[in-house]
Amino acid sequence: MNIELKLLNKEIIKEVPEYGTEGSAAVDLRACLSEAEFLSPGECKLIGTGIAINIANPNYAAMILPRSGLGHKKGLVLGNGTGLIDSDYQGELMVSCFNRSQEVIEIEPMMRFAQLVVVPVVQAKFDIVEEFSQRTIRSAGGFGHTGV
């Protein structure tokens, strides 16, 4: 699958997103900053990546995810949990960064700070009904219904 990638900041050409290994599911995104940004404990900031993508196929979307090591070791996670990039969005990829630690986190220019994965999407057609056509064993059992 080919996705068009637009460089919005010429500095990013030095570090164009690419897969790290043959088995990598995601590409790293870099912080397109002219100087370091500092996140205080509990603070959330939007950081640009300097790139835009054109997926152009409604059967796919992209998801921005945190980098495992940064979340676990430093406390840098996404402020919105997951960033969903629709196939028709063509603006700059922005990352909502949240500091869940008790220490100030420094985000350096061109630092790998999030990752992007392309995923298949199915657009469902919703049929409005009075009752479902079949009842499942779980039915309306909600959070923790299966034991957790």
UniProtKB/Swiss-Prot annotation:
Enzyme Commission code(s) on record: 3.6.1.23
Keyword Magnesium applies: yes
Catalytic activity: dUTP + H2O = dUMP + diphosphate + H(+)
Pfam family, one: dUTPase
Binding site for substrate: 67-69, 80, 84-86, 94
Similarity field: Belongs to the dUTPase family.
Protein name: Deoxyuridine 5'-triphosphate nucleotidohydrolase
Organism: Francisella philomiragia subsp. philomiragia (strain ATCC 25017 / CCUG 19701 / FSC 153 / O#319-036)
Upper lineage: Bacteria, Pseudomonadati, Pseudomonadota, Gammaproteobacteria, Thiotrichales
